Amino acid sequence: MSAERPLRTKLRTAQGRSTSSQRWLTRQLNDPFVRLARQQGWRARSVFKLQELDERFGLLRRGARVLDLGAAPGSWTQYAVKRGCRVVAVDLEPIEPVAGAVLLQGDFLDPAIQQELKERLGGPAEIMLSDMAAHATGRRLVDRLRAEGLGESVLEFAAEVLAPGGDCLLKLIKGGEAALLPRAN
């Protein structure tokens, strides 16, 4: 995977954009992994995180049942399907269809959505992926607590849906109690 650094691209117009939006857009325009993801047909650069972890730990095996939480825009779902997995994915935001995957739109924290995920899986999941992030408020403590609460909810659900020996891959922003979460069973 090669991501050569191109010449710096500047934002042509900043009209109507906040400073943070301008910074994000400039970063996107100049990120070699964004360009590489587009060239390879992936929906987001985050696919390379999953690919690296899969290559290192052998997480995604052909035929495995995979639950993808916080799936939009769908690059992790795309990758898991490409690896031959049976994927059920959910996000608050709509997800463009991915051939071979079951996609749901809804709040993962809603018990009705959790029940539907279990039904759609058709059995225990071999791996649960979560690239979810709580909506940011800009207040560090509140954001950290929300992220930790979301991570705990993912782990609680993993205990319900994972097959014995199953894996849970969870993105968590470091801070506070986050150091305790990886030790959870």
Model-predicted regions and their roles:
Residues 2-5, 67-69, 98-101, 128, ...:
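C-terminal substrate-binding/active-site "lid" region of AdoMet-derived donor-dependent transferases
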Residues 86-91:
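Conserved SAM-binding motif I beta-strand of class I
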Residues 73-84:
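Conserved SAM-binding loop of SAM-dependent methyltransferases across substrates and taxa
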Residues 2-62:
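Class I SAM-dependent methyltransferase Rossmann-like catalytic core
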Residues 64, 85, 166:
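Glycine-centered, small-residue-biased loops immediately flanking beta-strands
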Residues 92-137:
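S-adenosyl-L-methionine
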Residues 62-72:
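Conserved class I S-adenosyl-L-methionine
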Residues 55-61, 121-122, 160-161:
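Glycine-rich helix-loop-beta junction characteristic of Rossmann-like nucleotide cofactor-binding loops
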